[in-house]
Amino acid sequence: MTQTRKPFIVGIGGTQRPGSSSELALRYCLAAAEKAGAEIDLICGAELELPLFDPGVTHRTPAALRLLQSLRRADGIIIATPSYHGGMSGTIKNAIDYTEDMRGDVRSYFDGRAVGCIVCAAGDQALGATLIGLRSIVHALRGWPTPYAATIKSNEKPFVDGKPARREVAQPLEIVASQVVSFAEMAMASRVDDVAPRLVASN
């Protein structure tokens, strides 16, 4: 039995400022995933302006419900964050914290999902520290960080008119997209094989 639907890839990232480097990086990466055969969903900007996560509060805003609905459906995830003082942005971390609502799911948190990581920052130290932290969070949520991650120097004008200004900006994002889609397809095929009927030879 073979899987027929496209892998569904969710992108989370950016800042409250439209056209930020992390948002543009995420948009380009998702577009590359779509070209690779995926169905995509972008959650960024105002859609990430969620109430501070409180596990004791059961009410969820429409934006939070949309985030959770997409993540539950996702076969792969791409997260793009700026680096603020050596770590990921509070906005992105708060959105990720909402996955606690997925704790009791059959595929809890990010379980069984490939997760691509993108970090934008002005300096190498911030890029490295934030990427390590983001990968650690993905591991804690049972996700599979892709072997390759994209780091972008936001102070070097990496985007022009919303597109990568140079090949060295575009290529890492394309690699992340390719790996997320490829791993998502493999995981989907594995799940299909697990439920496929088995033929047993009779004597």
Regions found by a protein language model. Give the residues of each.
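N-terminal beta1-alpha1 ligand-phosphate binding loop
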Residues: 2-37
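Glycine-rich phosphate/pyrophosphate-binding loop and the adjoining helix
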Residues: 2-10, 144-203
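A general structural signal for well-ordered alpha-helical segments in protein cores
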Residues: 9, 22, 26, 64, ...
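Short, glycine/serine-rich, charged loops/turns that create anion-binding
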Residues: 16-17, 47, 122
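A generic structural motif
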Residues: 36-41, 143
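N-terminal beta-loop-helix "entrance" segment that forms/cooperates
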Residues: 45-62, 158-162
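Helix-loop-strand module that forms the ligand-binding subsite of alpha/beta enzymes
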Residues: 62-141
